[in-house]
């Protein structure tokens, strides 16, 4: 178990202030934005000056991109327009560009639109063009790259950042990248540095994920509750994310009513929060309430139409008997393809036994970018779906290397072991998956039951 697990228990004895925003992938973005804006005392003076660019930077493409007008009537769109105006009036000062960059990050998080992370990265490029090549630009760039799943580039930038400055969010983004790449021990060490510097929602939520990732569910729940206790009522999305993660941990523990309460809390704090709706749909499916699950999952998939969301919706619709609508959703998954979530699409194809060569290709491409347990699992599953079970075996070993207690990892490992005639491990892993089968989608639970029956029949014939 990583050293972070031992050291966290000591830090829990400290007293904590009211904490701010956090998510695992982009956990600290809004607190940075709030701090930047709070420290900025510039007032807008209507008509005081011409807001058109009169600066050599106006010819630099990244600067033009980030100042381009965009449509939208939501409050976040007004924030972006205001920050763009301030950037123009400050002659593209680095602080103004930094605030604009974090506002784009906020927009990306609220809308699940990754194109705004691209704009945040362009803000960092524009900052550097002004000569501001210091840690503030590096943090913004590392954050954007990590959110865009450009992990190798992000790691390079994050390591450069922590070599020049050692603030909590610097270690946070480095840890995020390393965890995504499968470098769990290094990521845990970065998170420990973050905790030592600032024990708050952001650092404890990250530590909770590491606990879960390394098989300590109870520790993950304890730390996520600690993170939530330090959240601010003014920071709704952060607390909503933490409550959503807690709900999934509670569901895995079998505490379904507590899990529902956690999703209620998340949605009270942040209405239309797709991850909480997805989690709530999963819980309702586990409680055998598919019509209610469909309502949640329809909304979630509309807000964030990634393969995992639409897969859950299709399964829920099938359970209600609406197979025609389920087929429509499945067709949409294929039409959208794997551009936004190659790994998720690969898993879907392999589970359905469709276009397995594409599933392999997508998973292999992902593995060149990040080598975490979930990507190894995706490749193992795709190879097995294509009948290449011997090649799948080493990736199963990697997928289970952190002792992650995840129903999907265990399901895939058990089926692949059975296909490789390893009945002992097949029985063990399928049994472990069955203990937390509430974490699987209905089509996966069907596979689990079918393979457990096959193993049972095979063993009975040997007796």
Task: Describe the predicted segments one by one.
Residues 91, 95-98, 132, 165, ...:
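Residue signature of alpha-solenoid helical repeat architecture, marking inter-repeat boundaries
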